[in-house]
Amino acid sequence: MGSRTKFCLTLFLVSVLILCAGLALAKTDPELKQCKHQCKVQRQYDEEQKEQCAKGCEKYYKEKKGREQEEEEEEEWGSGRGRGDEFSTHEPGEKRLSQCMKQCERQDGGQQKQLCRFRCQEKYKKERREHSYSRDEEEEEEGDEEQEEEDENPYVFEDEHFTTRVKTEQGKVVVLPKFTKRSKLLRGLEKYRLAFLVANPQAFVVPNHMDADSIFFVSWGRGTITKIRENKRESMNVKQGDIIRIRAGTPFYIVNTDENEKLYIVKLLQPVNLPGHYEVFHGPGGENPESFYRAFSREVLEAALKTPRDKLEKLFEKQDEGAIVKASKEQIRAMSRRGEGPSIWPFTGKSTGTFNLFKKDPSQSNNYGQLFESEFKDYPPLQELDIMVSYVNITKGGMSGPFYNSRATKIAIVVSGEGRLEIACPHLSSSKNSGQEKSGPSYKKLSSSIRTDSVFVVPAGHPFVTVASGNQNLEILCFEVNAEGNIRYTLAGKKNIIEVMEKEAKELAFKTKGEEVDKVFGKQDEEFFFQGPKWRQHQQGRADE
């Protein structure tokens, strides 16, 4: 009943205001009086409703007066336009103020002139504030660009860039902040996050689920990952080289089954709620990790679990050791046994299981390195996320590339070793300060040292090279996003793109004879992996001796 009365009051008030607006020939005060009078004479309204109606009239009147005043000020401020005064909104503020003041002199009466001048000055101050704000924004954007240029390589991440999400005596989880936090150039990776899990021997990662689709790669160690899907348990014994897809919302838990070695898992996450932001939810747990069951009222839990309050309190208050705890040998043996039937891909219908990258023959291999690559047919869950996984092992002193990907952006993690990365980047080029005119872009060499746990990104289309040190092999895990239809274009060695071009195209592009171009680009007889620059310098030094 109350809601109907409110609706009627609102409807009546709107009708009254429309009626009053029609009294355009009447003065403003009579218009307000007429509105209030209509409120008073309504017999179906009590005193409170009549008062609300009158307040509505006053609110409408004030808003209408405000709009009229703004229009009047705009007219005074820009009244010189179209009158032959060569006055426009793009002229400097001082001139606009002067023109406005001149218009005020035409006003009748001292008070009208004074009010007009005051409005001109206020408008001038407002315009100056807006101009200053706009200029500050431009300077801030320029500052951001300069900051990115000053940053040696915004595509490389080291230990200091990671944050720790979980840390206990039995292990930790570290996460790389959103890629865009480092540089706006990484906006293409805004919806992805990268995390590392390190679990000590016989450690147990308690059950949880995430609001993110994820790809796990076991970079070291062995263990068991158990997923709960549609009231069925799938347990997978995993080892180095295994790829596992965990769907968003899927409960899972992990145990390190080794008694001596740590378990290392690299996780690429694609959040499903907020781009670049994901949460971990713990059901089984207590105070640490906090169980989401504790968020519900006791009455709800008692009814849902059909258990008295005192028992619920005991259950959800015991766990305080964190999200990674120690398991006994007996518990590990029980959890490492196969779940409800075999679950390794591709022997189980719809199961996503696992795929081991190292069981494939390398797609590229010579004395200087090996490249292992997954394909969508190897592990179909990758196709759903449009992600490919690869692993490169560069022999010490060797190098891979230069090459570039046509569509895929590479997120690379150094698993072992050290070396150097070089990227040709047009975005951070300093050519705009060189004063030299060019018909195309200029490129800046982004060079960085990389080592175990370094992360680097190579955007699509950017040529790059990785060089291993002379001390040990350089092993790199790569996630390539936007992988569907990607083509790798090699820039040196066998099958490089220059060799395929016509002689005339080479001559026109390099402004030299085609034979000379062929001598340079046809000399390297290896493919993809080559002898690195350090080896070459070392051998030349020995030859000079």
From Swiss-Prot:
Tissues expressing the protein: Expressed in seed.
Keywords: Allergen, Seed storage protein, Signal, Storage protein
Chain ranges of the Cupin type-1 domain: 354-517
Biased composition (Basic and acidic residues): 82-93
Record flagged with keyword Signal: yes
InterPro entries: Cupin_1 (IPR006045), RmlC-like_jellyroll (IPR014710), RmlC_Cupin_sf (IPR011051), Seed_Storage-Functional (IPR050253)
Signal peptide span: 1-25
Superkingdom, taxonomy of origin: Eukaryota
Segments of this protein annotated with the region Disordered: 62-93, 129-154
Acidic residues compositional bias, start-end: 136-153
A Pfam family that the UniProt record links to this protein: Cupin_1
UniProt-recorded Gene Ontology molecular function terms: nutrient reservoir activity
Tagged with keyword Membrane: no
Functional summary from the UniProt entry: Seed storage protein.
PANTHER family to which the protein is assigned, alphabetical: CUPINCIN, OS03G0336100 PROTEIN-RELATED
UniProt similarity note: Belongs to the 7S seed storage protein family.
Name the record gives this protein: Vicilin Pis v 3.0101
